[in-house]
Regions:
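A structured beta-alpha segment of the ubiquitous adenosine-cofactor-binding alpha/beta core
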Residues: 85-92, 158-177
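N-terminal Rossmann-like NAD(P)+-binding subdomain of aldehyde/semialdehyde dehydrogenases
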Residues: 1-91
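Conserved small-residue-rich beta-alpha loop and adjacent elements
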Residues: 69, 73, 78-147, 151, ...
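Short hydrophobic alpha-helical runs that function as membrane-insertion/retention elements
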Residues: 124-128, 180, 199-201, 267-270, ...
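Conserved C-terminal structural/oligomerization subdomain of aldehyde/semialdehyde dehydrogenase
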Residues: 4, 8-27, 222-229, 236-292
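ALDH superfamily catalytic-core signature
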Residues: 30-34, 147-150, 185-244, 250, ...
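Short, structured coil segments at secondary-structure junctions
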Residues: 174-175, 194-196, 284-285
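Hydrophobic/aromatic ligand-binding patch that stacks against planar heteroaromatic rings
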Residues: 117-119, 190-191, 280
Length: 292
């Protein structure tokens, strides 16, 4: 029950956390590499239930590499000013945010990266989703719990709660310090509207693709096989059959739809028309825009 999870996170002792963050990250990386066959078994169960995509160890290791580039962790003291005359050094200690709720669709790569980043920050974290890739995510959390136990740190530092009732989750606002919502625009708006605590929303790892010509279709098909969260918009006269795609009449309708219903994280156009490519770059509201 969520009430039990919330109760557990209120009594977590973090005294052993500071000096063990990076060793634990290194150990988690080693475990996922050495036990990748076991992770694949859990992943294959997800795939067999149409509840996940095939994991790639190279992507997993890239996530670790990127996170480990972060210079500071929970408990570090950073120097902001040094007064040589008075022989005083001014600085600040990095504290945790507190109790963080991460609401996302369950993508394993997102769970892994957010687990690592919240570990760096010393945050207690509950991952809330509707059960997508549950086997893979549960394997990850179990490995992390085992590592935490070995370092004499509460295993409740990271937990998963499976639900579609986000109202229940948000009702515990008195015990939540931050909500991070990662998903499509509908989910973002719903959480933002109902949340009573500080909330960060992002379309991270959600993509909008507009196809108006058949250039690079091989590359497109490879992208669609990755399991990424993709909104696909196809020009209606191309006769391309994708059941999840939205058909649009032209570049203007595509841009309007992406700006209205898109995730505003990453958008791409597949085109051979340089004018339309330029229009797409200038008018689409996304953090990342690419041309293919």
């Amino acid at each position: 029950m969520l009430s039990d999870i919330i109760k557990n996170i209120l009594t977590i002792d973090k005294r052993n956390l500071k000096e063990n963050i990076r060793p634990m990250i290194s150990e988690l990386k080693e475990r996922l590499n050495s036990n990748f066959d076991l992770l694949k078994e859990a992943n294959n169960v997800d795939i067999s239930k149409n509840n996940g995509f095939k994991l790639d160890l190279n992507i997993i290791n890239n996530i670790f590499a990127n996170v480990l580039k972060e210079p500071f962790t929970y408990g570090d003291i950073t120097v902001s000013f040094k007064d040589d005359e008075k022989k005083i050094i001014y600085g600040k200690e990095i504290f945790d945010v507190g109790n963080v709720i991460v609401i996302n669709e369950g993508n394993f790569y997102v769970t892994l990266e957010l687990l690592l980043r919240n570990l760096l920050a010393g945050n207690t974290t509950i991952f809330v989703n509707y059960g997508y890739m549950f086997g893979s995510n549960n394997f990850l959390i179990n490995e992390m719990e085992s590592i935490l136990k070995n370092y004499d740190i509460s295993q409740n530092l990271f937990q998963i709660y499976v639900t579609e009732d986000y109202d229940e989750v948000l009702s515990y606002n008195a015990n939540i310090d931050l909500i991070v919502c990662i998903g499509n625009k509908f989910l973002q708006n719903m959480i933002l509207r109902k949340s009573k605590v500080k909330t960060i929303i992002t379309g991270y790892d959600n993509f909008d693709l507009y196809i108006e010509s058949k250039v690079n279709l091989g590359f497109l098909n490879e992208i669609l096989k990755t399991g990424l969260n993709i909104n696909l918009y196809i020009k209606d006269d191309l006769n391309l059959n994708h059941s999840q795609a939205m058909l649009v009449h032209d570049i203007n309708e595509a841009i309007s739809q992406i700006n209205y219903t898109g995730n505003r994280y990453s958008s791409a156009i597949f085109t051979s028309n340089s004018l339309n490519a330029s229009k797409f770059i200038n008018e689409v509201k996304s953090k990342i825009i690419t041309i293919n």
